[in-house]
Amino acid sequence: MVADVLLTHFNQLFCLNDPGHPLTGQEMKKATIVEDGYIAIKDGLIVALGSGEPDAELVGPQTIMRSYKGKIATPGIIDCHTHLVYGGSREHEFAKKLAGVSYLDILAQGGGILSTVRATRSASFDNLYQKSKRLLDYMLLHGVTTVEAKSGYGLDWETEKRQLDVVAALEKDHPIDLVSTFMAAHAIPEEYKGNPKAYLDVIIKDMLPVVKEENLAEFCDIFCEKNVFTADESRYLLSKAKEMGFKLRIHADEIASIGGVDVAAELSAVSAEHLMMITDDGIAKLIGAGVIGNLLPATTFSLMEDTYAPARKMIDAGMAITLSTDSNPGSCPTANMQFVMQLGCFMLRLTPIEVLNAVTINAAYSVNRQERVGSLTVGKEADIAIFDAPNIDYPFYFFATNLIHQVYKKGQLTVDRGRIL
């Protein structure tokens, strides 16, 4: 087979044998590091991988050849938890945060999520589209090729649908692949204050059926947290969403452990997000149900909290984990997955191999794209992040700098030395 593109002489390729399930426990510690590696691409797919000189049959008169001495290649990075589409920003709350006002106290004062809800409701489709596109461009420049994007800053049907429509439009227009999550249960809107059940009934009866019918989202999510939605309320919504055919995610055990992990396990959610306050019993329940723990260390960093999710304990117990940005305008205003990956080492005490497995193959399972992306594997799409680094440890050791040299998306050179092509 003659390749369309042949990428050669990488210092290292980060490869693994996809076992057909999210990596857990000791599997998280393993990878195949190919020295002097090459990747052959045809029709947007990886058709060969190896070390040294490529087989002659891969090279034809039209094959594009590129050498990458001094560089490493990983699968395209996957950010599987973002709140991509929103209006406004919340830097006006930053001084309060520095003064020690808590996240929930800011929310109780009408700020936080509710502040962004007001800004998003007043924002046009074009405004939301352009703002979200800029974030996606930034992510792409940092090596991200697939992104999960939630609604949840409308809390009414008109605005929630506008957010989902923006995600759908960007999925068509932008190189990054987007996976849509419906999260109207992100907070209790002011017009339903004191009556969350009535709001959940509106979501179940009036919103979810349309989202499913128009294929606007693949996943449904809810914020199960003190002063937001209880475990029983979360179970009520997610069980109805599951009956309608949605895959499930849940924000759980972020600030307090109130039963969200139990709901995730009972309903076999694909992932439980945050988990800073998870208990040993909660970890055991998620392992037993096969729920992926999606950890968001940049949120803990941004909130200036001391308690990070117990990633080391999770892995050692046999749990599958991912890492994501939680990109949003309040609790985590960043879109930099490289920073998150570095926090995975510095604050969660994970190794570079564990982090790379978390943000590639496990993240692919978290967004149900494991058949297409998440590993440098023959037959998968050629989503490739190329780092200006001599080995896979270097991008973690040399922190706070964008080390992306190039990005390939479906076999096309999409980012080249700080420019989107």
From Swiss-Prot:
Please give the catalytic activity noted in the UniProt record: 4-imidazolone-5-propanoate + H2O = N-formimidoyl-L-glutamate
The metabolic or biological pathway listed in the UniProt record of this protein is: Amino-acid degradation; L-histidine degradation into L-glutamate; N-formimidoyl-L-glutamate from L-histidine: step 3/3
Q: Name one GO molecular function term.
A: imidazolonepropionase activity
Residues involved in Zn(2+) binding: 81, 83, 251, 326
Q: Which UniProt keywords apply?
A: Cytoplasm, Histidine metabolism, Hydrolase, Iron, Metal-binding, Zinc
| Main location group | cytoplasm
Q: Where does the chain bind 4-imidazolone-5-propanoate?
A: 90, 153, 186, 254, 331
GO biological process per UniProt: L-histidine catabolic process to glutamate and formamide; L-histidine catabolic process to glutamate and formate
Is Protein biosynthesis included in the keywords of this UniProt record? Answer: no
Xref: Pfam families: Amidohydro_1
Source domain of life: Bacteria
- State where N-formimidoyl-L-glutamate binds: 153, 328, 330
One GO cellular component term noted in the UniProt record for this chain: cytoplasm
The keyword Iron is annotated on this UniProt entry? yes
> Can you quote the record's cofactor note?
Binds 1 zinc or iron ion per subunit.
Q: Where in the cell is it found?
A: Cytoplasm
The cofactors named for this UniProt entry are: Zn(2+); Fe(3+)
The protein's enzyme class = hydrolase
Any idea which positions bind Fe(3+)?
A: 81, 83, 251, 326
- EC numbers, comma separated: 3.5.2.7
Query: Which PANTHER family does the protein's record reference?
Result: IMIDAZOLONEPROPIONASE, IMIDAZOLONEPROPIONASE-RELATED
Record function comment: Catalyzes the hydrolytic cleavage of the carbon-nitrogen bond in imidazolone-5-propanoate to yield N-formimidoyl-L-glutamate. It is the third step in the universal histidine degradation pathway.
Q: HAMAP family recorded for this chain?
A: HutI
Give the protein family: Belongs to the metallo-dependent hydrolases superfamily. HutI family.
Q: Tell me what this protein is called.
A: Imidazolonepropionase
Record the organism.
Answer: Streptococcus pyogenes serotype M49 (strain NZ131)
